[in-house]
């Protein structure tokens, strides 16, 4: 693990014009995972479609290298319904995939990103967050339990998923 100074991280929001490096980074992450099936395959057209649907993709840069990334996805009515929560879906975001470069794992970057993006999400008008994580993805579930409450487990597309909830106004314990 390479140590880093989180104070030197630069957060950038990706646009349609700067997705190529992110796709290479995503493929590196997927190849380095013990179970790459936790991640779907992505393409530039898919990411462009997400951005056009008001999703936000953030990369965290350290010494010119993407070391971590996260997505903020607007929830739809169905996602909020599946959660079992009685919330206005316009106020709910879904945390999309969060990745950490293999050389920088162990620096608590996933936790750092969630706390950092909480302020971004509040500025975008969101009040609540939902995270859906494959039940077998132990590392991501352990991180999610630090910033959210496990509210239910569902079966979606033949996979067992844990659903976490976070009230963005109150943040997370650090």
Feature annotation, model-predicted:
Residues 65-68, 139:
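Glycine-rich acetyl-CoA-binding "A-motif" of GNAT/NAT acetyltransferases
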Residues 68-97:
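Conserved acyl-donor/pantetheine-binding loop and adjacent beta-alpha core of acyl/acetyltransferases
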Residues 47-59, 68, 94:
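A short helix-loop-beta-strand connector motif used in the catalytic cores of GNAT acetyltransferases and
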Residues 87-88, 95-106, 133-134:
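A short, internal acetyl-CoA/4′-phosphopantetheine-binding micro-motif in the GNAT/acyltransferase core
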Residues 2-44, 59-61:
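Short amphipathic alpha-helix that is part of the acyltransferase structural core
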Residues 155-174:
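C-terminal "cap" of GNAT-fold acetyltransferases
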Residues 123, 134-154:
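Conserved active-site alpha-helix within GNAT-family acetyltransferase domains
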Residues 97-100, 106-119, 142, 146:
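Conserved acetyl-CoA-binding loop-helix of GNAT-fold acetyltransferases
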């Amino acid at each position: 693990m390479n140590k880093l100074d989180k104070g030197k991280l630069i957060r950038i929001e990706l646009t349609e014009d700067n997705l190529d490096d992110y796709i290479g980074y995503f493929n590196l992450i997927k190849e380095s995972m013990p179970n790459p099936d936790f991640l779907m395959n992505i393409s530039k057209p898919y990411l462009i479609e997400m951005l056009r649907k008001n999703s936000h993709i953030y990369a965290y840069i350290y010494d010119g290298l993407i070391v971590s990334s996260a997505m903020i996805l607007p929830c739809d009515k169905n996602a909020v319904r599946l959660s079992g929560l009685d919330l206005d879906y316009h106020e709910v975001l879904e945390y999309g995939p969060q990745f950490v470069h293999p050389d920088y794992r162990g620096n608590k970057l996933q936790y750092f990103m969630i706390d950092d993006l909480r302020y971004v999400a509040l500025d975008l008008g969101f009040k609540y967050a939902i995270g859906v994580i494959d039940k077998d993805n132990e590392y991501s579930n352990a991180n999610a339990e630090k910033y959210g409450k496990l509210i239910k487990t569902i079966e979606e597309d033949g996979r067992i998923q844990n659903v976490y909830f976070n009230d963005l106004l109150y943040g997370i314990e650090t």
